[in-house]
């Protein structure tokens, strides 16, 4: 292939840019006092003062900039735009109205000091939007000072490795797709990849959507939902860098393993300080010591062991626990509980009324109404304690006066002697005993007073809530029966958390939080009530929810439609953006996935369009015995390893089956690892795992080890699960079974292997 006509010019520009980056890196190291690249020598005095805090912040910012410069030394940019802004247009960097200028786009912006000239524009900058969404010709983009219109005359893409120009091409749509296909053909590592250089137009729209408005992203499997959500966070931090810190953005993921999977890409995007947790982890932080212990319920694993009637019954319970309508019921119940907790009698000390029922109600329901319930009880208690102290002090003073009067009478009536002294001692002893009794009575009085109020124990109130719901509607009785056993053990299950969070907010209040944008991944498995609870906790509409309705394998606990959260939660209905292009898997793999979901279509999920990247047909091996089945799987995995594939998943339906399979696989492939529900680190390599763990992950190759009709019945639930399994691999997909293959593969374009699985 002939070398590009401007190759030498671009190599010279790259060399010049790399020298500038090196100079800026050396300046940054000198500014920080770094010698020999040893960042550990940096020390900032921390004496708790405001000056020390400012110094720490400035140092962190400088270190972040230094890290970005070091990364830029390997690849300072990946694209070039030649753009001529119209006359009078607001401009960025070196752009001038009416002048055709070249702008280089990189993962990080590079400023040349001391004049602070933009040598490389950050991919998140407004002008970089032209790279992702513009084609040569008339274009425009939104800048802080207004809309910029003009003529885009060139889009050029570069491949740069370790500071050397390895490839370049001037792109229209065709060239860009070729560049994307080459990037997707690479072998995976044990981590999610950043895709700054290959963001597509539909993804770019999602990334740059208004950060203050709610957004739902319906993305087909392999459309880059998670990756794009992380890039959206990076863009938000760039866009709102003056008002939002990384710690004020939150990623909610389904489990610790998934968090491990995504966490390694965050430093590449400069967002490693963003908070990441699960919903349970967030509840722990918000509720503190009020957070109940959770039963370690592997819900999907349990569902996989159920028959359809049992699964349907569980789905009904989950649906009721996660329904948005439950929010109104919780509010109603708290109002009723609020009133039922008030003592129905005057609070007396002996015959003296310390606080009347009417006063209790006024303090509790009116004066302290702005406090949560338990805080109100505490505030009323302060009033009672104050009055109790005054009453005891008054009684003590009366007792002292009485003793003084009796002592005075004794002194006047009797001469000094043993008898008078004995009577005086008796008088003082009686006084001291009475004072001790009064002090002890204070303690017992307060215990008795506290017992007059209704319970504020979270799990007790939650149990009372479902008893109330069951009494109002017998259809809620199964929910009560399913909930009480765990509560009796002072535990809850994950699906209880949204309601518990709302109850805790009303009962005690929650710890304050300054989160300004929330990203919820795998949002199809989040209940409407959970979204509502999060909205109430954070008190803003800055939410990004990404998911795929086709992968909703947690039954009715999750969303059946994005319309489930379309009304009644946010200030305005969320925009629903669709990512319909599947980038992960080859055309041949996606054709199998389409066939699987075609048997049980999901309303509103959309139809996936695979990138035109071809590979080998998925295979189906029907073995005569289990031994043949496992042996065939092992041979296949060994073949994949010889071909150089790094990320391989061997999937069994259940954890028990995965454990047994791993025991067989590891004898022939020692590096094979058994991944379980409790693992919180995604390491890559050959991994044997059960079907409940793979959603959201991707691999080079996947072997579904038990793809028979008995293991995966022809039901909607199993169709969704099978679809998830089919859409995990980038390059290779194999099904193995003994007996009749799953009906999900009945019309799927798979290549049959012989019964020995060779």
Residue positions per predicted region:
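Extended, charged low-complexity regulatory segments
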Residues: 1-196, 200, 204-205, 743, ...
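Conserved P-loop NTPase-based nucleic-acid remodeling module centered on helicase motor cores
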Residues: 89-131, 271-338, 688-690, 701-704
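Well-ordered alpha-helical segments embedded in enzymatic catalytic cores
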Residues: 198-206, 232, 329, 502, ...
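Hydrophobic, well-ordered secondary-structure scaffolds
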Residues: 220, 227-241, 250-251, 493-520, ...
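Conserved helicase motor core of SF1/SF2 NTP-dependent helicases
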Residues: 242, 256, 260-272, 277-281, ...
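Conserved helicase NTPase catalytic core signature
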Residues: 336-517, 530-531
